[in-house]
Amino acid sequence: MKQSHFFAHLSRLKLINRWPLMRNVLTENVSEHSLQVAMVAHALAAIKNRKFGGNVNAERIALLAMYHDASEVLTGDLPTPVKYFNSQIAQEYKAIEKIAQQKLVDMVPEELRDIFAPLIDEHAYSDEEKSLVKQADALCAYLKCLEELAAGNNEFLLAKTRLEATLEARRSQEMDYFMEVFVPSFHLSLDEISQDSPL
């Protein structure tokens, strides 16, 4: 059997730090971020289905979110101000991401490719799936800002403001629910969030 470097590449996502131009109290890597986005995206899909009459596959949404930044193992994590400096750079970076996604898909053994390609290639996502993953991605970046600010790192003040605008632009009923029910706890200490559920 032919060897594949696919998972060896993906394991290196933990070596790519996010927010590279900003001082961080706690460094976050792409692997950690992807897990959190998967959990939040799954929650958004479940909330949409249970509370607001949605009919999405929450497990698929979680998988899409888990792989949503996989191409960064080949491209690196380009800082947002650079990525969106102008429309030409944004468009070129999208093209680079597409090439990187295809390169990852090509690493998968042929007999498994049809399973992994729809997870890695964002063009295979439906509009609804893409929206949920993007909401979760923005929410997790926002939560990172809250954590950094709670630790006294004002470096993230402007990023928080920018992400509030992004969240408003991507707003949905399931996001409103998540923001109301789950986000306030991110302003609390470990002792405060542990009071209601002693071991």
Swiss-Prot record:
Site note Appears to be important in orienting the phosphate for catalysis, residues: 18
Signal peptide: none
Family matches, as Pfam families: YfbR-like (PF12917)
Keyword set includes Iron-sulfur: no
Cofactor: a divalent metal cation
UniProt keyword annotations, A-Z: Cytoplasm, Hydrolase, Metal-binding, Nucleotide-binding
Binding-site residues for substrate, renumbered to this chain: 18-19, 33, 69, 77-80, 137
SUPFAM superfamilies per the UniProt record, alphabetical: HD-domain/PDEase-like
Nucleotide-binding listed as a keyword: yes
Sites where the protein binds a divalent metal cation: 33, 68-69, 137
Major location (coarse): cytoplasm
Entry EC no(s): 3.1.3.89
Gene Ontology CC: cytoplasm
Family annotation (InterPro entries): HD/PDEase_dom, HD_domain, YfbR, YfbR/HDDC2
Compartment annotation: Cytoplasm
GO molecular function, one term: nucleotide binding
Subunit structure: Homodimer.
Protein name as annotated: 5'-deoxynucleotidase YfbR
Native species: Escherichia coli O139:H28 (strain E24377A / ETEC)
